[in-house]
Structures are given as structure tokens and as C-alpha cells.
Amino acid sequence: MPTVVGRVIDLNFEPFYIDMVRRGIVLQDVSLKDMPQALRDGVVSAGPVSLVDSFALDDVCDPVAGFCLAASNRAGSNLLYSKKPLEELSGRTIAAATADSTTQELFRVLLAEKHDGNIDSFVAMAEEHDAFVISGDDALRRRRGARGYQHRYDL
């Protein structure tokens, strides 16, 4: 019986291990937002999840030590575009252009820890907002800017 590892289709990385096929490792395409449920349902035995999602999976998964995804320079895949400077966003309306909970949590932590601020929740892009967070390929496509938003932050 093969070990099924989730390959996140909306990120620019892929899990690999030497001689995967010979070792009985099979990749299954899964969306990042669907990975936690795929792990819970047993569709996959392993796969990358966001740090935020990992907290809710400790009853069904064990973290694998020694592995992580990181960037030493600006990644450009978790962005905040704002009409106001970051330090003025506490209590303002913030939209989420993508459904990535990690990017939203990165923004919350940055605002709270660096600027002693907070927000209640994120709104849809169609609603009036002062700033928006965006992640993944959508953020990479908009890495040069967003019309009407003078401030850009790489979270």
C-alpha cells in the first residue's frame, strides 16, 4: 500500500524524496485550503500545511522535524496593499483577496506586535476597504503594485 503525500497545487514547490516510486510514495494533487481536511479524511497521509492550520491537526498528524519552507529574501507571495501606512491600519477595514489564513494571520501578528494594533475581521474585496492582503500566485502576479494603493508590504 503506497504512502500518499499531498502535492499543493497552488504553491510553487513540490514534495520530493529520492526514489519515491520505489519506496511506495505517491503524490496526490490537493489545494492548500483543502489539505487539512484531506489529512483528516485520510485522503493523504502527509502533506505541507500552513503553520496556522497545523495547530488544529495535532490530533491526527505529527509534525516532521527538520523540514520547513522559508525565504531568506522577500518572497513576494504574501502581500499587503494599503492606502495608508501600516502603522495607521489598526481598526481599519481590511479585505482578503485570497482565502489564505496564514497571510491573514501574518498581517494580524505584524500589526499587533510591531504597531500595537488590531483588526476584528477581514471583509470581501467587493466591500469598501482601506487595505487588502493577497497571497500565492495572485500576489506574485500583483507584485509590482495595485492601482490606488500607495503602500506595499511583503509580509
Language-model features, listed with the residues they occupy:
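Structural signal for conserved beta-strand scaffold positions within catalytic alpha/beta enzyme cores
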Residues: R7, D29, A65, A96, ...
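Extreme N-terminal starter segment of soluble prokaryotic enzymes
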Residues: M1-V5
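Short helix-initiation/N-cap motifs at beta->coil->alpha
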Residues: L27-R40, D116-I134
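Ligand-binding cleft/hinge of the Venus flytrap
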Residues: F13-G24, T103-S121
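Short, glycine-/small- and polar/acidic-enriched structural segments
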Residues: V8-G91, T98-D100
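Structured N-terminal alpha/beta-domain signature
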Residues: L39, C68-L69, F107, I134, ...
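Pocket-lining segment of extracytoplasmic ligand-binding domains
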Residues: I119-L155
